[in-house]
């Protein structure tokens, strides 16, 4: 069972870092680029960067829908990060937390896809 938990945790962490990389790329393409640190930084540094990105999303000169996609991708990423972080504390409820983290990452990915599509249309 412990091996399964370790694998699921590792898979979720890998997905979290992949979505972070996508968020970082999209943020560089915004009308007012947002520079997020590379994905090799400390977890706290990444959390603070995504939180800051969420805070300044409203300052982007983009339509409401695109802004909502940016904010949603940040919030979903932060939510997944919180859920994945609970593994360290062995608080139980693994199955629903696994699924919630997966869905949060899926939501972030979908929002980033929408935002990337809007950015392509502007080119």
Predicted regions: what they are:
Residues 1-3, 66:
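Intrinsic disorder/low-complexity signature
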Residues 3-60, 97-120:
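Alpha-helical segments in soluble extracytoplasmic regions
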Residues 62-98:
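Long, amphipathic, charge-rich alpha-helical segments that form helical bundles/coiled-coils
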């Amino acid at each position: 069972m412990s091996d399964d938990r370790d694998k699921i945790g590792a898979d979720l962490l890998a997905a979290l870092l992949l979505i972070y990389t996508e968020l970082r790329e999209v943020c560089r393409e915004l009308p007012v680029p947002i520079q997020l640190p590379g994905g090799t930084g400390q977890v706290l540094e990444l959390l603070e960067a995504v939180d800051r990105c969420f805070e300044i999303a409203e300052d982007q000169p983009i339509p409401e829908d695109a802004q909502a996609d940016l904010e949603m991708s940040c919030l979903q990423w932060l939510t997944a990060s919180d859920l994945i972080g609970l593994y360290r504390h062995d608080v139980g409820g693994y199955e629903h937390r696994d699924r919630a983290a997966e869905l949060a990452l899926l939501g972030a990915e979908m929002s980033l896809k929408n935002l990337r599509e809007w950015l392509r249309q502007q080119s």
